Amino acid sequence: MPESNLTKKALAQTLKDLIHTQSFEKIGVNDICDACQVSRKTFYYHFRDKYALAEWIFDTEIIALLQKCDLEDRWATIQALCRYFYDNRVFYAGLMQFQGQNSFRYHFAEFLFSAVEKFLLPERREICAAADFGGVTPETAQAFYSRSIADAVLLAMYRWLRGGE
């Protein structure tokens, strides 16, 4: 494994460890660097900020997980994703608390939107029927459907991570 990936993984694990004791909002790049025993220069060589590090963690771990899944078996894939989030719930609960510019919620919402577009859309004829009924184009109906499902999953995930409200 290239040294660059080892450094990224070390920074990632450090952030995951720190979020167990501090809120994401209060964790600074200095905290990550001190705990990981690397310089700020090293951190900024790999990531533009802590938000980019959090997104990298999500992206690399989700990609690795999805590569192991049979994507044709939707329920098994969903089950694997649920297990991943359960195993990493403290980390993601910490990330989901932060709202605002560069928030993980936005990145996660975009991931969900893409996932719905690829794996959970109804058949084309159903989208066309909904579009006809609503007086919109099929593309508009598809985007509305995808965004609605993605937003519902995001809200359910947020509530679950906050303690099951």
How would you describe each model-predicted region?
Residues 1-22, 26, 31:
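Basic, helix-initiating cap at the start of DNA-binding domains
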Residues 11, 30-35, 43, 85:
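Append "Primarily bacterial transcriptional regulators
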Residues 20-24, 37-54:
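HTH DNA-binding helix-turn interface
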Residues 28-29, 57-65, 71:
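Short, basic, alpha-helical segments at the C-terminal edge of helix-turn-helix-like DNA-binding modules
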Residues 60-64, 88, 92, 115-123:
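A short secondary-structure junction motif
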Residues 67-94:
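Hydrophobic alpha-helical connector segments
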Residues 68-69, 92-95, 123, 127, ...:
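Secondary-structure edge/capping motif, primarily at the C-terminal ends of alpha-helices
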Residues 80-83, 101-133, 140-155:
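Amphipathic alpha-helical packing segments from all-alpha helical-bundle domains
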